C-alpha cells in the first residue's frame, strides 16, 4: 500500500459507514422522543452513535480487505507515557481556564453561591424521598473535579474508544499524506459535521440561541477542530490511540461542571463550557501551538525512521 498518498476510496467508505450508522441512531432518538424524551436516548447515543466510528473502521477494513495492521491499539506506554499524562490532566486545566475567560467577559452569569448545585441536591432528595444532604456546594464541585480527573477517563474509555478507534486510529492516518495541518482541518470538519443531528436536537448548546441549530453545528465544528488537533497530536506522538481515548474521556467527564457556576441564561454556544466558542479558547491556544510547531504533527512510524522523515519532508515542503 502506498502511504504517501491519500487512499480516498477507503476514506469515503469509512465516512459513509461512520455517518450512516450514527445518523440512523440519531433518527431513532428523534422518532422516539428526542434527546430529552426518548427512553432509548442514552443507549442509542453510547452504542449506536459513539460506537459508529469504530464499527465503520472495522467494516471498512473488511469490505476493502485491508487487513489488520496499524490499528493503533498497542498502548506503547514506554514511548508515549508523557502524552498519556498530558492528555489525562490538560482537559481539566483547559476547562477551568475557559470558564475563567468566559466569566471574566460575562460576570453577570457567574454565580459564586453555586445555587445550581443546591438545586440539584434538593431535586435529588425530592426524587429519593430523603433529606437534603448538608454539603457545601463547593465540596460537590471539588469532588466532581477529582472524579473527573481520576476516574472519568477510565470509566469513559470503552464508549470513547468507539469514537477514537475510528477517528484517530483510522481516518487520521488515512488523511496524513495531506500534511499534518491540513489533516487536522479536515478531521475537525468531518468530526464536527458528524455531530450535526444531535446538535440539532439540543446536545451541548440547547436550542435557545440565535441561529439554532446552524450556529451550534458551526461551534461544534470549531470545537472538534481544536480538540481534535490536541487529541491527534497526542496520538501521533504516542503512536497509540489510547492517549486520545483518555483525553476525550477526561473532556467528557469535566465539561459539564461549568453548569454548576451559571446563573441567568448565558448563550451556551459561547460558553462557559469548553465546547463553547469562548470556553474553548485555552484549548484553541494549545491547538495553535501544535499547528505552528513544524514537527508536532509529523507522520507516525511507517517502516523505518528514514521512511518517516522522507514522507514527512515531502508533505511539508
Question: Where do the PLM segments sit?
Answer:
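Membrane-helix interface linkers and caps
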Residues: 2, 30-36, 42-92, 101-123, ...
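C-terminal membrane module of polytopic membrane proteins
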Residues: 62, 207-217, 247-317
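Hydrophobic alpha-helical membrane-insertion segments
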Residues: 85-109, 187-190, 232-237, 241-248
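Short, Lys/Arg-rich, polar N-terminal cytosolic tail immediately upstream
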Residues: 1-8
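Membrane-interface helix/loop boundary segments of multi-pass membrane proteins
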Residues: 160-193, 232, 236-240
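Hydrophobic alpha-helical transmembrane segments
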Residues: 126-156, 217-227, 280
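Membrane-interface interhelical connector segments
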Residues: 125-130, 199-212
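Alpha-helical transmembrane segments
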Residues: 10-23, 86-94
Amino acid at each position: 500500500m502506498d502511504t504517501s498518498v491519500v487512499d480516498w476510496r477507503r476514506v469515503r467508505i469509512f465516512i459513509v459507514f461512520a455517518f450512516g450508522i450514527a445518523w440512523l441512531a440519531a433518527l431513532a432518538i428523534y422518532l422516539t422522543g428526542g434527546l430529552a424524551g426518548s427512553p432509548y436516548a442514552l443507549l442509542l447515543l453510547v452504542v449506536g452513535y459513539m460506537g459508529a466510528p469504530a464499527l465503520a473502521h472495522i467494516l471498512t477494513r473488511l469490505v476493502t480487505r485491508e487487513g489488520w495492521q496499524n490499528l493503533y491499539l498497542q498502548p506503547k506506554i514506554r514511548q508515549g507515557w508523557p502524552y498519556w499524562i498530558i492528555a489525562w490532566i490538560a482537559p481539566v486545566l483547559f476547562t477551568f481556564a475557559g470558564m475563567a475567560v468566559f466569566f471574566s467577559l460575562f460576570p453577570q452569569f457567574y454565580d459564586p453561591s453555586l445555587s445550581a448545585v443546591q438545586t440539584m441536591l434538593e431535586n435529588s432528595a425530592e426524587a429519593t424521598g430523603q433529606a437534603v444532604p448538608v454539603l457545601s456546594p463547593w465540596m460537590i464541585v471539588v469532588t466532581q473535579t477529582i472524579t473527573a480527573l481520576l476516574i472519568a477517563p477510565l470509566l469513559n474509555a470503552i464508549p470513547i474508544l468507539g469514537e477514537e478507534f475510528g477517528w484517530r486510529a483510522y481516518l487520521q492516518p488515512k488523511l496524513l499524506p495531506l500534511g499534518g495541518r491540513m489533516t487536522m482541518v479536515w478531521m475537525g470538519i468531518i468530526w464536527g459535521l458528524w455531530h450535526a443531528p444531535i446538535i440539532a436536537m439540543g446536545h451541548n448548546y440547547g436550542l435557545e440561541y440565535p441561529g439554532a441549530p446552524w450556529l451550534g453545528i458551526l461551534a461544534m465544528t470549531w470545537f472538534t477542530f481544536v480538540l481534535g488537533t490536541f487529541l491527534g497530536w497526542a496520538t501521533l506522538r504516542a503512536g497509540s490511540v489510547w492517549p486520545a481515548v483518555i483525553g476525550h474521556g477526561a473532556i467528557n467527564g469535566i465539561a459539564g461542571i461549568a453548569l454548576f457556576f451559571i446563573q441567568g441564561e448565558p448563550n451556551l454556544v459561547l460558553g462557559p463550557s469548553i465546547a463553547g466558542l469562548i470556553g474553548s479558547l485555552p484549548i484553541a491556544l494549545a491547538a495553535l501551538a501544535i499547528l505552528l510547531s513544524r514537527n508536532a504533527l509529523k507522520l507516525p512510524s511507517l517502516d523505518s525512521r528514514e521512511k518517516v522523515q522522507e514522507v514527512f519532508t515531502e508533505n511539508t515542503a
